[in-house]
Amino acid sequence: MLDPKFLRNELEVTAERLATRGFILDIAHLTQLEEKRKSLQVATEELQASRNAISKSIGQAKARGEDVEAIMAQVGDLGSQLDAKKIELAAVLEEVNAIAMSMPNLPDESAPIGADETENVEVRRWGTPRTFDFPIKDHIDLGEGLNGLDFKNAVKITGSRFIVMKGQVARLNRAIGQFMLDLHTTEHGYTEAYVPLLVNEASLLGTGQLPKFGEDLFHTKPATEEGQGLSLIPTAEVPLTNLVRDSIVDEDELPIKLTAHTACFRSEAGSYGKDTRGLIRQHQFDKVEMVQIVKPEDSMAALEALTGHAETVLQRLGLPYRTVILCTGDMGFGSSKTYDIEVWLPAQNTYREISSCSNMKDFQARRMQARYRVKADNKPALLHTLNGSGLAVGRTLVAILENYQNADGSITIPEVLRPYMGGLTQIG
């Protein structure tokens, strides 16, 4: 959520910056609402003051033995007018808030301006794609050949975009997640967390999935008088970041660095016809998430570090990748600056996204009222939040199967994963 004061004082600047993201802000309508808000605020305060003043005169009139019926009627009339103005004001504030909640974050000045993914800017590459001396297979054929990927039974049990993994492929998938967690906790300074896979509406509002992206979620329980609705998490970013919702943390506690390995659930409502085969785009998938909660002045350096942590996973696995900075038109809703890391997939002869690392600045913190107490003046200030995949486990499995395949369909196990595989050097 954007800073309301900045929005009011710098409306045209805000509109210009949001336009680079493809979001058109109706300046005239917002200006009209702001003028109406001010007018109603003044009217409400004046009515309140008048009612209070006249109410005080009732006691004085009674003390003098005067009839107060007319004064009581006047107070009642002012009360009715006040209630009506309060209802009008609440409606205006609700509309302003709805508009504010629909606005994406302002892009950082260092983010390249562009309309879509074709205008993202590559910043570096690592590794050289392998040259094969035999016809290569994609991860689907490789996984099925190893009797490790069972799409048919997944469809029978649940439906499309799900997977059953078995045997050494399932073990390899587990090993990948364990390796990532161990790396982040022992070398990168993250604390491992185990979090709920179901979250309430307040949590999804806090991190920005609601109200705009409700159709992308799997909702399991509707809201009732007894409580909020529950939805399956689309990413562990939601529960991890919400750990500081409605909190004021001490400055000495920062930075807070958390990681979790969870299943994630997405309806892929806007992805009809994309990646319909294989593991690239599933309704349920595993991901190791990294979250950092930092002081505002530290967030840009934290983004570089967090992106480096995700890249280190690929380097240790020996998987070629490239890192791109997303242009304004391709960034996620809550992001001010994002790096995407794309791993090389030989069967597709291209790089595909395997991690997205973003600095949200105070966008989520304002929605969550997540603050820290500044030691210098002992006053609370909004935190900055960052998140990134470290990495998507299923896509990492895809990359390993394809990059480490052998002519006979077997898969060489990357060296760093062998301790997690009981010392195996290959499967198949």
Swiss-Prot record:
GO terms for molecular function: ATP binding; serine-tRNA ligase activity. It is found in: Cytoplasm. ATP binds at R266, S267, E268, E353, I354, S355, S356. L-serine binds at T235, A236, E237, E289, S389. It is an enzyme of class 6 (ligase). HAMAP family: Ser_tRNA_synth_type1. Catalyzes the attachment of serine to tRNA(Ser). Is also able to aminoacylate tRNA(Sec) with serine, to form the misacylated tRNA L-seryl-tRNA(Sec), which will be further converted into selenocysteinyl-tRNA(Sec). This is Serine--tRNA ligase. It comes from Shewanella baltica (strain OS185).
